[in-house]
């Protein structure tokens, strides 16, 4: 007969009672009233906060944007095809956040930081809010370090500094994305983390950019955030903030970052679509009233941090497309007023074969020479002045039939200077090569050459200087000054190469 031991039974019962945890969980729920066009109207959810994430019964997540007296307007982060009228919705008590880590380098992700390159999951132990506040005034310091783009026209006359926001603006097909991608390619070996955000682009265009980065080894230090044209409006609206959150992760770890937004006008269109479907009152060009805040809170996150926060930086290059050169439209004027300058690309210059098609006359950097090394300041001042005078003379020369010799010489010099600013795509130049190119042009060494020979001569001169006068590059990179010794080496190289070049051309 089995003996029942009362003490054992009572011990087991006590243990079970101790383990019992009666947790009462209050969940804020609601019911779907209607759903469609990426928008859901919810009844209930009384305690929900603006911007809070809500979860639908079938797993779709949305963001509560409109808090009205009778219902809540939610934008869906997905197609929401399985959401039914009358199904339940619960508030999560969280706002949108993404995982962040070093493992994101070299990957292509969507607006929720989920990989879309088919290379498996990305490990991350830390999270950042998609919309985190920008650094305050005390946390920042003024921009003083150059961020080299590798493009002579920009680095000499419209310099960009680390922590600056510089707008790239122009009509479609004027090479705006090419300027941005060349800047990323030029960061190789500069210890700069790059983030390229593609908003509402064609999938083929994004694939082309990624392939370009992979072929040139730029994906090692680059993250691509992509939401293509067929993505829901909510995800196109979130993509730039996701890119900024990934860049901030590195910025607050004392690193330098560069973020390209391509382009914020598509984000504004997605936000306009969401706002109109939520029945928010339309304003100018049917955009909602807070479209300025949409971009200002994004671009203000770019900063040069002070010494207390580790001196990291985030440089932002937003790209905005204009319609037939109209920079006075709503979104272009908004972004111009937020940024620290703009690089204007002209369709006329592009079609005339001047590429990159940068209109130097109306482009501006509000940081200026603070974002240049001393050597560049020494040679670039003369270039900008001579090009400005040339532009003025060229307009005048169209009406004048007989020009004096001095004017003819000035026009000839200007044409050669314009020629030296031309560069092939995906061929950024080191700052030493740029200084050498500008010096050669502004000091009249190219005046004796035909316009068609200028680029060929400069390419050969760069090669000659690298192989025969490596000290020149060493002096500039170590001292950052265009010393007398460097100038003597350069003059010598130009004269030697000019003799060789003339002999070659005669043969």
From Swiss-Prot:
- Report the locations given in the UniProt record: Plastid, Chloroplast thylakoid membrane
Q: What EC class is this?
A: translocase
Q: Does the keyword Chloroplast apply?
A: yes
EC number(s) recorded for this UniProt protein: 7.1.2.2
Any Pfam family matching the protein: ATP-synt_ab_C
Which InterPro entries does the annotation name?
ATP_synth_asu-like_sf, ATP_synth_asu_C, ATP_synth_asu_C_sf, ATP_synth_F1_a_nt-bd_dom, ATP_synth_F1_asu, ATPase_a/bsu_AS, ATPase_F1/V1/A1_a/bsu_N, ATPase_F1/V1/A1_a/bsu_N_sf
Which residue positions hold the site described Required for activity?
A: 363
**One GO cellular component term:** chloroplast thylakoid membrane
Specify which residues bind ATP according to the UniProt entry for this protein: 170-177
Keyword Ion transport attached: yes
Keywords attached to this entry: ATP synthesis, ATP-binding, CF(1), Chloroplast, Hydrogen ion transport, Ion transport, Membrane, Nucleotide-binding, Plastid, Thylakoid, Translocase, Transport
Q: What does this protein do?
A: Produces ATP from ADP in the presence of a proton gradient across the membrane. The alpha chain is a regulatory subunit.
Tell me its family: Belongs to the ATPase alpha/beta chains family.
Protein name from the UniProt record: ATP synthase subunit alpha, chloroplastic
């Amino acid at each position: 007969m089995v003996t029942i031991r009362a003490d054992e039974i009572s011990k087991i019962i006590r243990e079970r009672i101790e383990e019992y945890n009666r947790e009462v969980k209050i969940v804020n729920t609601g019911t779907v009233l209607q759903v469609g066009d990426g928008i859901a109207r919810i009844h209930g959810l009384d305690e929900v906060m603006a911007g809070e994430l809500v979860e639908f019964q079938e797993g779709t997540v949305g963001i509560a944007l409109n808090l009205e007296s009778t219902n809540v307007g939610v934008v869906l982060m997905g197609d929401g095809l399985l959401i039914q009228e009358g199904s339940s919705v619960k508030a999560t008590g969280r706002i949108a956040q993404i995982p962040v880590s070093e493992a994101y380098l070299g990957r292509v992700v969507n607006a929720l930081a989920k990989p879309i390159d088919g290379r498996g999951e990305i490990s991350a132990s830390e999270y950042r809010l998609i919309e985190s506040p920008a650094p305050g005034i005390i946390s920042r310091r003024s921009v003083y370090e150059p961020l080299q783009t590798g493009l002579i026209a920009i680095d000499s006359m419209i310099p960009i500094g680390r922590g600056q926001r510089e707008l790239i603006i122009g009509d479609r097909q004027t090479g705006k994305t090419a300027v941005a991608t060349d800047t990323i390619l030029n960061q190789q070996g500069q210890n700069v983390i790059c983030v390229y955000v593609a908003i509402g682009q064609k999938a083929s265009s994004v694939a082309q950019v990624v392939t370009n980065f992979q072929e040139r080894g730029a994906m090692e230090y680059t993250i691509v955030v992509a939401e293509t044209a067929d993505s829901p409006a909510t995800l196109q609206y979130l993509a730039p903030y996701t890119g900024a959150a990934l860049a901030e992760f590195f910025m607050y770890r004392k690193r330098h970052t560069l973020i390209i937004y391509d382009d914020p006008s598509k984000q504004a269109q997605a936000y306009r679509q969401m706002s109109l479907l939520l029945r928010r009152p339309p304003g100018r060009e049917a955009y909602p009233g807070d479209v300025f805040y949409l971009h200002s809170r994004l671009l203000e996150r770019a900063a040069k941090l002070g010494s207390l926060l580790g001196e990291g930086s985030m440089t932002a290059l937003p790209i905005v497309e204009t319609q037939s050169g109209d920079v006075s439209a709503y979104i272009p004027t908004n972004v111009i007023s937020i940024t620290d300058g703009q690089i204007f690309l002209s369709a006329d210059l592009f079609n005339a074969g001047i590429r990159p098609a940068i209109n130097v006359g109306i482009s501006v950097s509000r940081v200026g020479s603070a974002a240049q090394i001393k050597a560049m300041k020494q040679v670039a001042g003369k270039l900008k002045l001579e090009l400005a005078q040339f532009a003025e003379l060229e307009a005048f020369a169209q009406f004048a039939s007989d020009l004096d010799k001095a004017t003819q010489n000035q026009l000839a010099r200007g044409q050669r200077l314009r020629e030296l600013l031309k560069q092939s795509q995906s061929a950024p130049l080191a700052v030493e090569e740029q200084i050498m190119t500008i010096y050669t042009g502004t000091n009249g060494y190219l005046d004796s050459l035909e316009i068609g020979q200028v680029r060929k001569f400069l390419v050969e001169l760069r090669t000659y200087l690298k192989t025969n006068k490596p000290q020149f590059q060493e002096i500039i990179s170590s001292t950052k000054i265009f010393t007398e010794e460097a100038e003597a080496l350069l003059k010598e190289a130009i004269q030697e190469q000019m003799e060789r070049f003339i002999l070659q051309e005669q043969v």
